[in-house]
Amino acid sequence: SGSCSLKTCWLQLADFRKVGDALKEKYDSAAAMKLNSRGKLVQVNSRFNAPTIHDLVYIDPSPDYCVRNESTGSLGTQGRLCNKTSEGMDGCELMCCGRGYDQFKTVQRERCHCKF
């Protein structure tokens, strides 16, 4: 009897946060395009570098996510809670779209079901 060795390669997805961050970066730097008279996609602003096959492009601009829009299903951001100290997506400056925000402090009391 003989022996053989096997190697198995596993494909594994990257961490969800990393994938989301990469997509957001691509989205933020996507190139605006339009159709020319021949039906070919051309850049709206030729001052920028032409998009590569790895870049995102768009024809129609994204809706304003700050404002409620029933046709797109966007609820907007008005009335949502934000984090005053965060510079991320949950931060008040970004989430409130420059409209300002109300500050308040709250105390929450919860039963912890602790046993001593």
From Swiss-Prot:
Q: What is its main location?
A: secreted
Q: Where is the lipid attached (O-palmitoleoyl serine)?
A: S1
Q: Name one GO cellular component term.
A: extracellular space
Higher taxonomy: Eukaryota, Metazoa, Chordata, Craniata, Vertebrata
Give any single GO term for biological process. cell fate commitment
**Cited InterPro entries:** Wnt (IPR005817), Wnt_C (IPR043158)
Post-translational modification, as annotated? Palmitoleoylation is required for efficient binding to frizzled receptors. Depalmitoleoylation leads to Wnt signaling pathway inhibition.
Q: Which family does it belong to?
A: Belongs to the Wnt family.
Example GO molecular function term? frizzled binding
Residue positions with a glycan: N69, N83
Q: Which UniProt keywords apply?
A: Developmental protein, Disulfide bond, Extracellular matrix, Glycoprotein, Lipoprotein, Secreted, Wnt signaling pathway
According to its UniProt entry, the function of this protein is described as: Ligand for members of the frizzled family of seven transmembrane receptors. Can activate or inhibit canonical Wnt signaling, depending on receptor context. Required during embryogenesis for extension of the primary anterior-posterior axis.
Q: Detail the disulphide connectivity of this chain as listed in its UniProt entry.
A: C82-C97
Name used for this protein in its record = Protein Wnt-5a
SMART domains for the chain? WNT1
Query: Where is the protein localized?
Result: Secreted, Extracellular space, Extracellular matrix; Secreted
**Pfam families hit by this protein:** wnt (PF00110)
